[in-house]
Structure formats: C-alpha cells, structure tokens
C-alpha cells in the first residue's frame, strides 16, 4: 500500500503541461509563473486541478525549488490558485473574470463592390495572367541561393532597369536604375517620401479637389494640408503661393488631374518647378493612369522637365491589376540615401520573385502588348458611359470625357441643392465616389467620379442609363442650365 501511495504521489507531482525555460534568462520564477498563468487562463489547467508540489515541479523542470515557490506565490496573488493546508496547491475552482480588452472602434475600411462605377478596377486579361504565372514559376523554380536571402531595399535591379527603360521611352523621364525604388503602391511610396523628407506639421500643397487616398496618407502622417484650387490648366500655383508660399512640398497629378481629368499646362508646370526651387520644396508627382492615353502623343511627365525637385510616383496597379501591389518611385540622386533608409526601416526590402517575373514580361514586350490590347477596350468603355449618360440624362449632367485615364467626371448644375448627388446615386443603385468626397473646401457643384475600367460594356450601359434617368428625375428641367 505504501509503495502504491508513493507511486500516486509521484504521478501527482508531474505537470501535464510542457514548460520550456530559457536558461539564459535569470528570472526562471517569472518564466514558470507566466507559463502556468497562461495554462490556467487558456483552460489547459482545469479548475480544481492539483498542481505538483514545489519540490516535484522543481525536479521536473530542473530548477531551484525557491523559483517554484515564488511562482506559486505569484499565482496565489493573482487569484489563479489556492493553497489547501496539508493537501497542496490547486487551480482555483472559481477563476477571476478575464480582463477582456474593450473592442476597438470599428475601422472605416471599406472595399467597394466590383460593379460600375467603382474606381481601381481593371479588365482581367487571361493572356497576361498565363504569361505572368509562367514567369513566376520559372523564377521560383530556378532561384539561386542569393535570391532567397535578404535583398536590396530598392527592389529588384532587373525590374528597376526595365522601369527606367519604360519611363525614358514613354514618359520622358531619364533616370538611372539606382534612383528607382520598387514599392507596394502609390500610397506606400508617398509614405516613404513623407518619412524621409518631411517633419510632422510641415505644410504641403494639395490639389482641391484631389485624390482622397493620398490626402489620407499625408494627413495621417502629420502633414498640414494646404488646399490649392484647380482650374482648366491644373493646379493654380499663384493661389498656392498666396495661401502658403513657404510650403515644404506639393502633391500633384499633372498629366491627368484627379478627379477633373485636366492636364497641367506647360506654363503652370514651369511655375510650379520655379516655386519648388525658390521655396526649397519637393514635388510629389503622382503619374497614375498615364499608360492609357486615347488621343495625341503621351504627355511628358513633370519629372522629365525638371526633375531635381520632383519625386515621381508610378504604379502597375492600373496597367495590370491592383492586387499585384507593385509600384515605383523615381528619386533625385541627392535624396536616394534618405528614402532608401526610410524603406529599410519600414520593411527592409520588397519580395523579389514577382518583381523579376514582371520584369521578364516587360523585357519580352508582353506588358507593352497588353497595354495595346487594353487601350481600345477602355476607350470603348469610356464612350459607352458618355453616350448612355448623354442619352438618358438629357442634359441634366455635364460630362468631361477624358483623353486619358480610367474614369470620367459628371457634374451637376450649379443650382442643384446640396445632397442631390447622393440622392441620385442611391436611386440609381450605382457604386461611385462623389466629387464632394474629393474636396477639402466645398465649393462648386457636386458630381460623380465614374470608373469605367474593369466592367463589361452592357453593365456600364445599364448603370449609366440608371444614373442618367435618376439625374433627370431628381433634377428636373428647372435645375438644368438653359
């Protein structure tokens, strides 16, 4: 009987919970306390379970008994165990209510449904996807050992070289691959520039109306936004100088202003570059949608005219698809080290395989062929929307059909009451941004920013019909210009 009792006691002195101790850390009692606390709170050690004696657990873990004594005393203070005189230490039968963190406020993260007229959608090209998949498989299958380790914070040299060739041929931007950084998109690139070049509270000119995502990126990074109005020639540089001539930077979309679609005139471009030199300021040039120009030669980018103050931002999100998460920065040579340091501090370096696969497609002419196939399809989509809105809206909306890009702007008459655009959108049952969403200062008529890429022609025509009829019904003849 005595032998049986001893066996029983030894079995009780074995903890059925693996505890791994870091012997390099001196406070072993804290490690034991933390492991036991987690086991009890997570339910791995049930209420009422007898814990091993301090001597038995010390032998099991190979530590001094006083470390276990200290751990048990801490658990007693936590209310997680109870000591029974002459019987040992047990997990408390009634555990304290767990301290549950209050739920975070609901995040305003909304992924718009893929239906007309959502922005940022592109047509799926099966030919391109097959070629990209094949290039990715080849890159992974034949990866050299040095391609599997840490990489350059600027990204793949192969892709940077191809981007440099593309920009020289199509955007008039001549740069060395060493001045290009591969990023995960325009907002990532913009944030890198902010971290590297600006301080919290620095004033930044921002087009008004302008691109909402970039406005959010700048404001959350601590920039002081200075709204600068836009007219038919683009950013009104003189208005910016009047509002805050000593601003540290300007964010612009000169080749295809978002959302108005106007191109910045050459006189304004020269004025903006002159201001940046005088003010020792930077220009963040977002050259989105530049690949899809439907009439006339491509416009030279601002960075191609006077690039020493210009940081150029480009993306493959519209050329290919947003889920690719690849974009690029072109940085003046004097600023490269600062921006690279900011990149290395954020996420060290970008993943290489998809970059090299995309570079292979660029080198083989696959990407250029893809854009040639897409341009007429997107031009047709633009025309379908414009014609349907004109037919069914019967003049209730003013249209600005762009010669470039993947969205058009339809504005209400100046006399339309506030809130009318939202009522029209809701009645039409469409997905789109309102022009008022893009404004910092609410001035001028409201309207609709209509993305037309990524949708079948019949779906675009149907959505435009519903929008046009809703506008006609709600505005009425009296609200239309005579």
Segments predicted by a language model, with ranges:
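Short glycine-rich anion-binding loops that position phosphate/pyrophosphate groups of nucleotides
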Residues: 122, 254-258, 318, 455
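N-terminal basic, amphipathic alpha-helical segments
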Residues: 1-139, 148, 159-161, 340, ...
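Short, polar loop motifs at secondary-structure junctions
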Residues: 209-212, 436-440
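Flexible, Gly/Pro-enriched loop and linker segments at secondary-structure and domain junctions
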Residues: 309, 432-433, 438
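Conserved core of the PLP fold type I
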Residues: 145-280, 291-292, 297-305, 309-311, ...
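Hydrophobic beta-strand scaffold residues
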Residues: 225, 283, 431-432
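Active-site PLP attachment segment
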Residues: 305-338, 350-353
């Amino acid at each position: 009987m005595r032998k049986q009792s001893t066996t029983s006691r030894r079995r009780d002195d074995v903890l059925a919970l693996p505890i791994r101790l870091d012997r390099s850390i001196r406070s072993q009692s804290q490690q034991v306390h933390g492991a036991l606390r987690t086991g009890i709170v997570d339910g791995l050690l049930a209420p009422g379970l007898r814990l091993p004696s301090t001597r038995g657990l010390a032998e099991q873990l190979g530590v001094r008994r006083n470390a276990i004594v200290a751990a048990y005393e801490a658990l007693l203070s936590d209310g997680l165990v109870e000591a029974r005189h002459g019987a040992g230490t047990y997990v408390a039968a009634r555990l304290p209510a767990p301290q549950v963190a209050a739920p975070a406020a609901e995040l305003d993260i909304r992924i718009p449904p893929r239906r007309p007229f959502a922005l940022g959608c592109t047509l799926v090209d099966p030919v391109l996807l097959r070629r990209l998949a094949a290039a990715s498989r080849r890159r992974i299958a034949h990866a050299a050992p040095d391609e599997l380790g840490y990489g350059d914070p600027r990204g793949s040299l192969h892709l940077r070289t191809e981007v440099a060739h593309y920009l020289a041929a199509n955007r008039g931007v001549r740069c060395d691959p060493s001045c290009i950084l591969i990023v995960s998109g325009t907002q990532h690139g913009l944030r890198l520039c902010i971290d590297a070049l600006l301080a919290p509270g620095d004033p930044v000119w921002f087009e008004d109306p302008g691109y909402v995502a970039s406005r959010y990126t700048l404001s959350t990074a601590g920039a002081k936004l200075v709204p600068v109005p836009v007219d038919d020639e683009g950013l009104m540089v003189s208005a910016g100088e009047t509002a805050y001539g000593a601003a540290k930077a300007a964010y612009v979309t000169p080749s295809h202003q978002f959302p108005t679609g106007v191109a910045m005139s050459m006189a304004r471009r020269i004025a903006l570059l002159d201001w940046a030199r005088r003010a020792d300021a930077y220009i963040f040039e977002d050259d989105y949608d530049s690949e899809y120009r439907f009439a006339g030669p491509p416009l030279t980018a601002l960075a191609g005219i006077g690039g020493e103050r210009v940081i150029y931002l480009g993306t493959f999100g519209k050329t290919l698809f947003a889920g690719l998460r690849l974009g690029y920065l072109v940085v003046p040579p004097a600023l490269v080290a600062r921006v690279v340091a900011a990149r290395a501090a954020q996420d060290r370096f970008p993943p290489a395989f998809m970059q090299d696969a995309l570079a292979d497609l660029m080198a083989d002419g696959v990407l250029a062929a893809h854009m040639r196939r897409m341009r007429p399809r997107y031009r047709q989509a633009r025309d379908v929307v414009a014609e349907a809105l004109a037919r069914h809206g019967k003049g209730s909306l003013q249209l600005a059909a762009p010669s470039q890009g993947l969205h058009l702007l339809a504005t209400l008459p100046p006399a339309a009451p506030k809130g009318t655009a939202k009522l029209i959108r809701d009645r039409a049952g469409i997905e789109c941004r309102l022009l008022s969403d893009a404004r910092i200062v609410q001035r001028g008529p409201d309207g609709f920013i209509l993305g037309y890429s990524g949708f079948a022609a019949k779906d675009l025509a149907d959505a435009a019909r519903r929008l046009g009829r809703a506008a006609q019904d709600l505005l009425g003849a009296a609200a239309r210009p005579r």
